[in-house]
UniProtKB/Swiss-Prot annotation:
One of its GO terms (molecular function) is translation elongation factor activity. Its EC number is 3.6.5.n1. Its main location: membrane. The keyword Cell inner membrane applies. This is Elongation factor 4.
């Protein structure tokens, strides 16, 4: 089969806030163009991870090729890239957008524009996309299409007068969306005779085929048996299979300019496939790679340890397999005195961390402990040397530190004005600095600069609870700012517990220290001797709780008789306890770790 001429191809992605009906619209487009038979249609076809279906969110970007016979009688090939809407997966979004020429902007006609819609639209505008606004859920009684169109124009600055009004659930007006794609989006550009340049959009692991690579061809052709080279790593592979998604893998003879498809090349490790890399022909390589690719930088780090130490190897293999699918996730081995062997893992954000943890426990059946999430600090020593600090336990002695810088973010929060006061109070409690506050209709848009350290723990949950779930939140990294930060160590029976150490601003150090000590007092089982649970900054103890001893009734078998007999036994017990306190080891149960780490917020 010869590849499709470029003027009949349209590559587009769907951008939307969480829950505005993006995956449902994708389902309808697949159904209308008949890419899957009625028997194979399931809800959210493109969300193929269980977690994605359960939480109703899209995590991995997915693609599908649709054939559509338009009103002008020509049959067009539409390549749909379904992108995630959540802020943590902005990296997946940026790659999908780089592979397309246009976007459908889906906005819920009853909710209006939300924070993540904005973030993704700006990314699409940066990628020079033609954007077609689509109002979804028009069948709801609460839908206000005119108000939302006005809002799109006011907030984003897009002309929404000819926005397509649809209901993805009932399938209303889906044809109009397909026509808009064909008439309003530009075809891809590309030169078939130039040296091969293809962008590696995503890669995942298949136990039969090895690594499957999702590619977007810019120039040249990709065909079976061709030897290709990855430009960033220099690895050379021979292509076994070329094809497209419908959403099932469908082999083709070759892929030409503008087409999106997959290749397999018996690649064993995904480490060879850097997402966003340029693939070129080994014999006639392109001179320079495609622009528009930035490697992802982890923002949040935490330690992952197996509950059962024997599972360490299993955890290592599982992480390696996940890394195959998720290029934005990093890990390195580390050890902890309290938790044994484990890994220090880097994530794009908290939802990303939660999902990786959940995938490890589901797909690989692992029981894990995660230490408190921390951000990357920059530590400047008195010697003038700068080190990056991923783990609070590695922080050197205070005397050698000149100053510490912490990452700040720029957060955009959209909230109905009834809840604005509570949201502003929350931001101020978290050391936020207000940058901007504007009103659009009855919704306020607040822009704040916040230290990432304060956001990492539970900012998102608190934001949702103070705004009754109406606020939406999006952020991008700003820069590093010097801060008065201290490391708080937790000591149990005079022994520091490395897994519980954390870094906080001096102003909140005391309250956090007290809270953790009080929590641990309830969680650690009582021993036969008294235990002190302390929080300390350097050598200064800032909080203490004492866990009382269990006492065994040693005088139980003395009946009556002389008091000195009882006293002798009690003295003996006291001696023993004193000795135990000196040499006794306190085992902290795993449940205590989990609960203490959860409450760090």
């Amino acid at each position: 089969m010869t590849s499709t001429p470029t003027e009949l191809i349209r590559n587009f992605s769907i951008i939307a806030h969480i829950d505005h009906g993006k995956s449902t619209l994708a389902d309808r487009l697949i159904q209308t163009t008949g890419a899957l038979s009625a028997r194979e249609m399931t809800e959210q076809v493109l969300d193929n991870m269980d977690i994605e279906k359960e939480r109703g969110i899209t995590i991995k970007a997915q693609t599908v090729r649709l054939n559509y016979k338009a009103k002008d009688g020509k049959t067009y090939v539409l390549n749909l890239m379904d992108t995630p809407g959540h802020v943590d997966f902005a990296y997946e979004v940026s790659r999908s957008l780089a592979a397309c020429e246009g976007s459908l902007l889906v906005v819920d006609a009853s909710q209006g524009v939300e924070a993540q819609t904005l973030a993704n639209v700006y990314q699409a505008i940066d990628a020079n996309h033609e954007i077609v606004p689509v109002l979804n859920k028009i069948d709801l009684p609460a839908a206000e299409p005119e108000r939302v169109k006005q809002q799109i124009e006011d907030v984003i600055g897009l002309d929404a007068s000819d926005a397509v009004e649809i209901s993805a659930k009932t399938g209303l007006n889906i044809e109009a969306v397909l026509e808009a794609l064909v008439t309003r989006l530009p075809p891809p550009k590309g030169d078939e005779t130039a040296p091969l340049k293809a962008m590696l959009v995503d890669s995942w692991y298949d136990s039969y085929l090895g690594v499957i690579i999702l590619v977007r061809v810019r120039d040249g052709r990709l065909r079976k048996g061709q030897r290709v080279r990855m430009m960033s790593t220099g690895a050379v592979h021979t292509i076994d299979q070329v094809g497209t998604f419908s959403p099932k893998l469908t082999p083709q003879a070759d892929l030409g300019p503008g087409e999106i498809g997959y290749i397999t090349a018996a690649i064993k490790t995904v480490a060879d496939c850097n997402v966003g890399d340029t693939i070129t022909d080994d014999r006639a390589p392109a001179t320079e790679p495609l622009p528009g690719f930035k490697p992802s930088i982890p923002v949040v780090w935490c330690g992952l340890y197996p509950v059962d130490a024997d599972d360490f190897e299993k955890l290592r293999d599982s992480l390696a397999k996940l890394r195959l699918n998720d290029a934005s996730f990093h890990y390195e081995a580390e050890t902890s005195a309290a938790l044994g062997f484990g890994f220090r893992c880097g994530f794009l954000g908290l939802l990303h961390l939660e999902i990786i943890q959940e995938r490890l426990s589901r797909e690989f059946d692992l029981d894990l402990i995660a230490t408190a999430p921390s951000v990357v600090y920059r530590l400047y020593k008195t010697s003038g040397e700068m080190m990056e600090l991923h783990n609070p336990a590695d922080m050197p002695d205070g005397s050698v530190i000149d100053h510490i810088e912490e990452p700040w973010i720029r957060a955009t929060i959209m909230v109905p004005d009834d809840y604005l006061g509570a949201v502003l109070t929350l931001c101020n409690e978290r050391r936020g600095q207000q940058v901007d506050l504007t009103y659009v209709g009855n919704r306020a848009m607040a822009v704040y600069r916040l230290p990432l350290n304060e956001v990492v723990f539970d900012f998102y949950d608190r934001l949702k609870s103070v705004s009754r779930g109406y606020a939406s939140f999006d952020y991008q990294m700003d820069d590093y700012v010097e801060g008065d930060l201290v490391k708080i160590s937790i000591l149990v029976n005079q022994e520091p517990v490395d897994a519980l150490a954390f870094i906080a601003h001096r102003s909140v150090a005391d309250t956090r220290g007290r809270a953790i000590c009080a929590k641990l007092k309830d969680l650690i089982p009582r021993q036969l001797f008294k235990i002190a649970i302390q929080a300390a900054i350097g050598g200064r103890v800032i909080a203490r709780e004492t866990l009382g001893a269990l006492s065994k009734d040693v005088t139980a078998k003395c009946y009556g008789g002389d008091i000195s007999r009882k006293r002798k036994l009690l003295e003996k017990q006291k001696e023993g306890k004193k000795r135990m306190r000196q040499f006794g080891k306190v085992e902290i149960p795993q449940t205590a770790f989990l609960a203490a780490l959860k409450m760090d917020a």
